[in-house]
Each structure stands twice: as C-alpha cells, then as structure tokens.
Amino acid sequence: MSIFRFFSKQTSAPTARERLQVLLAHERASVGQSDLVAVLREEILAVIAKHVQVDRDKVNVTMERGEHVTTLEVDIEIPMKAGVRAA
C-alpha cells in the first residue's frame, strides 16, 4: 500500500450513482406515478415487516406532485402489543 494512495481523494462515483438513481426515480414518477407508488409500497412493507407485524390492508402510500416539490406520504397502522412502547 502506497502512502500516496492513503491520502488520495475519494472517488465521486457512489455519490453520482445515488444522485442519478434519485433523478431517474423522479423522472419515472412523472410518467408512471402509480407504478412507482406500488413499488415503493411493497418495498416499505417488506422493510417494516422485518420488525413489526403489519396488516397490508391498513397501509396507504400516496404521492403528490406539486410545482416545486413531490411529497410521498406513508400511512401505516401499527397495532399496539404487550411489550411494545408507543413512540
């Protein structure tokens, strides 16, 4: 390992890739908004299901596009069980 490599600047590829993914998601949202919402809903449910049992019928995901901002709203009803504290 060279000492010069240790102090070299990190590449910007990961940051550029993340920005491109956000841009592509935003572009796709304008064309197929309902498809994106459905995919996001399933992915969010999969992540939450790892930690809490959730009734899939009680999950509502909506996306609203304004002139300058797009809002993603996720409404999930999580049942209270013994041993689970409210936030």
From Swiss-Prot:
Q: Which domain of life is it from?
A: Bacteria
Which keywords fit this entry according to its UniProt record? Answer: Cell cycle, Cell division, Plasmid
Note the InterPro entries from the entry: MinE, MinE_sf
* One GO BP annotation of this record: regulation of division septum assembly
What Pfam families does the entry give? MinE (PF03776)
The positions making up the signal sequence are none
| Similarity remark | Belongs to the MinE family.
Q: What is this protein's function per UniProt?
A: Prevents the cell division inhibition by proteins MinC and MinD at internal division sites while permitting inhibition at polar sites. This ensures cell division at the proper site by restricting the formation of a division septum at the midpoint of the long axis of the cell.
Protein name as it appears in the record: Cell division topological specificity factor
Species? Rhizobium meliloti (strain 1021) (Ensifer meliloti)
Organism lineage reads as: Bacteria, Pseudomonadati, Pseudomonadota, Alphaproteobacteria, Hyphomicrobiales
